[in-house]
């Protein structure tokens, strides 16, 4: 993929932050492209890797998070995951639990090589579907000392069980598997992949409110970007199939490092975060088939519910009127994120 050097984000560049494009490889040999943000006043040795939402690009919400945290002294890298945006990998618009988790670990690898970064003080932020991926990465890699999952989805659960677990039956999963198998056969015969479509457009009048919220972010000037799958033609029709038959948060009850899960009070996705938090602490929660031991280090785990906020309000803070107009609602608790990371990245003692 060709990389643009022009500023093409959906938000303006902060005057207090320096920015440059970077590239690094994951263990599968895929080149990932990121935006590195650095405070002009000098960093504090702490670094954050940021990704999400699922199907978005670094020019959207993850870039905003990265830039805002750089304003607060962190070296940050917002990156496009494999098969997405400016990063490499074929076929395009494909997702994989293992490769996506590896993408986060590769970003940690990259940050640990920078002279201005203390390799023992690295954290991650995952937004939407990448919130769940961030938890999986934290369960795998103890180099990650602090994790924020913002407005998270559990992509395995939603692909396997449907929204609100309404398709959690063998019959429903079998029907979905048959449909996906037919798509694969057709793709094999034709030699072409069919894109499944991003956020629905035109928007039906009777669409659920959360779909309207997605439309307002991805399809209008508020958050539209030409490289974003959600803003355009989406994943290919079986591009997320690998998530439907996996359960990748099995070991989050063993995360010893600090975790903050934050959700809007009115988010349709709130149950993903609340159930993940409970399972992470207790080893038992709705949506999780296993019953496991309680977390060995529960004291550094937090759940934050933001009053009045929707799912997409935590993408960019939200606005009082559609299309990013009106007054900014400022729903993202930047001070809380700064306090959480500085507290937990300053304490580098192994838990």
Sequence positions of predicted segments:
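Alpha/beta-hydrolase-fold enzymes
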Residues: 135-220
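Short beta-strand/loop motif that positions the catalytic acidic residue
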Residues: 255, 261-263
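Alpha/beta-hydrolase fold nucleophile elbow
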Residues: 116-128
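The serine-hydrolase catalytic nucleophile loop
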Residues: 55-67, 81, 273
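Conserved alpha/beta-hydrolase
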Residues: 68-88
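N-terminal cap/lid segment of alpha/beta-hydrolase-fold proteins
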Residues: 2-42, 324-327
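Catalytic nucleophile-loop/oxyanion-hole region of alpha/beta-hydrolase
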Residues: 57-58, 84-119, 322-333
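Catalytic active-site module of serine/aspartate enzymes centered on a nucleophile-bearing elbow/loop
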Residues: 309, 318-351
């Amino acid at each position: 993929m060709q990389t643009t050097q022009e500023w093409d984000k959906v938000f303006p560049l902060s005057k207090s932050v320096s920015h440059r494009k970077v590239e690094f490889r994951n263990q599968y040999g895929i080149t990932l492209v990121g935006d590195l943000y650095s405070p002009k006043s000098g960093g504090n040795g702490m670094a954050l890797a940021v990704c999400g939402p699922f199907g978005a690009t670094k020019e959207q919400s993850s870039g905003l998070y990265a830039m805002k945290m750089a304003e607060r002294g962190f070296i940050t890298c917002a990156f496009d995951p494999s098969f997405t945006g400016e990063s490499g990998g074929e076929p395009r618009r494909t997702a994989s639990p293992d490769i996506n988790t590896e993408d986060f670990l590769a970003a940690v690898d990259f940050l640990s090589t920078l002279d201005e970064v203390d390799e023992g003080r690295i954290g991650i932020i995952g937004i939407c579907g990448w919130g769940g991926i961030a938890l999986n990465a934290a369960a795998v890699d103890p180099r990650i000392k602090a994790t924020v999952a913002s407005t998270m989805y559990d992509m395995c659960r939603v692909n396997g069980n449907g929204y609100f677990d309404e398709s959690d039956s063998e019959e429903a999963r079998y029907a979905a598997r048959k449909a996906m198998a037919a798509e694969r056969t057709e793709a094999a015969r034709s030699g072409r992949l069919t894109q499944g479509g991003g956020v629905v457009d035109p928007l039906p009048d009777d669409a659920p409110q959360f779909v309207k919220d997605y439309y307002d972010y991805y399809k209008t000037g508020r958050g539209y970007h030409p490289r974003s799958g959600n803003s355009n033609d989406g994943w290919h029709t079986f591009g997320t199939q690998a998530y439907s038959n996996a359960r990748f948060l099995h070991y989050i009850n063993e995360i010893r490092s600090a975790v903050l899960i934050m959700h809007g009070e009115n988010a349709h996705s709130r149950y993903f975060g609340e159930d993940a938090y409970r399972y992470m602490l207790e080893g038992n929660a709705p949506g999780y088939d296993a019953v496991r031991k309680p977390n060995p280090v529960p004291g550094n785990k937090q759940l934050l519910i933001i009053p009045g906020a929707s799912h997409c309000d935590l993408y960019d803070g939200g606005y009082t009127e559609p299309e990013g107009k009106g007054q900014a609602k400022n729903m993202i608790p930047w001070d809380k994120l700064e306090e959480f990371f500085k507290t937990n990245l300053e304490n580098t003692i192994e838990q």
